[in-house]
């Protein structure tokens, strides 16, 4: 079966969002354009890392351009998107590998999210070789979401992604673990009393 690539250049909308209550949220990347929507599931840590890396890459683009780039230092207010994910949310795949690149010729950020694939290998070297072969296989590789964004769109995506990650459960002031509405067993209190 040929590889499925969900390609948006540029999308009308590209956001990170969640479904569910804090502590039980499922995280998604969602791209849409002209009535077509693609949603892929991923972990909270992946959303956080993606937002951080996008900001770092954009900062580097601005630094190398000497300030002449169209990339803004902060997310433009007019691109702020706080709307929920577009319904219905149908997961195309769960993300395993992500990649970022900056296309200097078109001044676009390229975000790729590939499906999680389990590989059987006898050694670390075999596993590394199998992973590399799979990622380079343009015809039979895992499904992939590929999105090309302007610098402004990428900054807006990163801001929203950080906001979504930070909108979860507040941390315990003692141990920094997330607090559930009913509290939690705090290791810094020897697990005997519930943190508030």
Walk through the language-model features, giving the residues of each.
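Mixed-charge, glycine-accented linear interaction segment located at domain edges/termini
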Residues: 113, 118-183
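N-terminal auxiliary interaction/assembly segments of multi-subunit proteins
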Residues: 59, 70-73, 159, 166
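Short Cys/His-rich local motifs and their 1-3 flanking residues in nucleic-acid-associated proteins
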Residues: 177, 188-191
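Intrinsic, low-complexity N-terminal interaction/targeting segments
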Residues: 1-27, 68-137, 141-144
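Generic structural detector for well-ordered beta-strands
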Residues: 41, 101, 146-148
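Short, structured motif recognition centered on aromatic/hydrophobic residues
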Residues: 25-30, 50, 54, 109-113, ...
């Amino acid at each position: 079966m040929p590889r499925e690539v969900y390609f948006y250049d540029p999308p009308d909308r590209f956001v990170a969002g969640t479904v569910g209550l804090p502590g039980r949220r499922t995280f998604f990347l969602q791209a849409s354009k002209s009535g077509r929507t693609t949603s892929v599931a991923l972990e909270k840590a992946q959303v956080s890392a993606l937002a951080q890396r996008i900001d770092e890459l954009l900062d580097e683009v601005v630094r190398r351009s000497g300030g002449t780039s169209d990339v803004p230092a902060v997310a433009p207010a007019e691109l702020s998107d706080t709307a929920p994910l577009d319904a219905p949310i149908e997961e195309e795949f769960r993300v395993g590998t992500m990649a970022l690149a900056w296309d200097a010729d078109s001044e676009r950020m390229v975000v790729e999210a590939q499906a999680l694939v389990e590989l059987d290998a006898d050694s670390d070297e075999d596993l590394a070789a199998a992973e590399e072969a799979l990622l380079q296989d343009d015809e039979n590789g895992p499904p992939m979401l590929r999105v090309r964004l302007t610098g402004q769109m990428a900054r807006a995506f990163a801001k929203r992604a950080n906001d979504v990650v930070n909108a979860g459960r507040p941390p315990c002031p003692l141990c920094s673990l997330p607090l559930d509405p009913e509290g939690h067993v705090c290791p810094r209190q020897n697990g005997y009393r519930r943190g508030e």
